[in-house]
Regions:
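Physicochemical signature of membrane-embedded alpha-helices that form the seven-helix bundle of GPCRs
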Residues: 7-10, 78, 106
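Conserved small/polar residues in nucleotide/adenosyl-binding loops
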Residues: 156-163
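Membrane-interface transmembrane-helix boundary segments in multi-pass integral membrane proteins
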Residues: 125-155
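Hydrophobic alpha-helical membrane-insertion segments
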Residues: 103-119
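Early transmembrane hairpin module of multi-pass membrane proteins
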Residues: 1-24, 28-32
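Membrane-interface helix-loop-helix modules in multi-pass inner-membrane proteins
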Residues: 46-88
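Membrane-interface helix-boundary motifs at transmembrane edges
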Residues: 27-38, 93-99
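Membrane-entry segments of alpha-helical transmembrane domains in multi-pass membrane proteins
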Residues: 1-13, 69-71, 142-152
Length: 163
């Protein structure tokens, strides 16, 4: 849980940043935003893969299989495909302006998947439990587990010390 949940949070936040910055880049043509989104994408893909793999490991004893076509798992796989599409568009399309336009459109469409991932456990009957941590209202997770979880999420995103 201490690896899986923060990795999933970061993967969602990373793609949200990519999508929003890509939309701004599509409208305002700010080249620095392209560099930022291209830098975030591989990291977000890595965290998405970590979330999927650790979720499979976590789910095996509970569900009896490493993979189930659950709504949240499937939508996370779709998120990984959006990350891959975003990355490969920049790698394969030689015209930078065209690559930016296409990848911005892909990212904007991928943004639709973020609330699907978040609310899939509430909208459909899934194998995943409902959210244990709530911004509004009381969380169902004990503070002795919440603090390490938030600390690991913070450590995932903190810069490494310089040598």
């Amino acid at each position: 849980m201490y690896v899986h949940v923060p990795a999933a949070w970061i993967s969602l936040a990373s793609f949200s940043c990519i999508a929003l910055l890509s939309i701004f880049n599509f409208i305002f043509k700010i080249k620095h935003l392209t560099l930022i989104t291209k830098s975030i994408a591989p990291i977000g893909l890595m965290f998405t893969c970590i979330a999927i793999v650790t979720g499979s490991i976590w789910g095996r004893p509970t569900w009896g299989t490493f993979w189930a076509w659950d709504a949240r798992i499937s939508s996370m796989l779709i998120l990984a495909l959006f990350y891959l599409a975003f990355i490969f568009i920049h790698k394969l399309v030689s015209d930078e302006d065209r690559a930016n336009k296409i990848s911005s459109i892909v990212a904007a469409f991928g943004l639709i998947n973020i609330p699907i991932i978040k609310y899939s456990v509430e909208w459909w009957s899934t194998l995943h439990q409902p959210a244990s941590i709530k911004i509004t209202g009381s969380s169902s997770i004990h503070s002795s587990m919440l603090m390490p979880l938030l600390l690991i999420c913070l450590l995932y995103t903190s810069p490494s010390p310089r040598d």
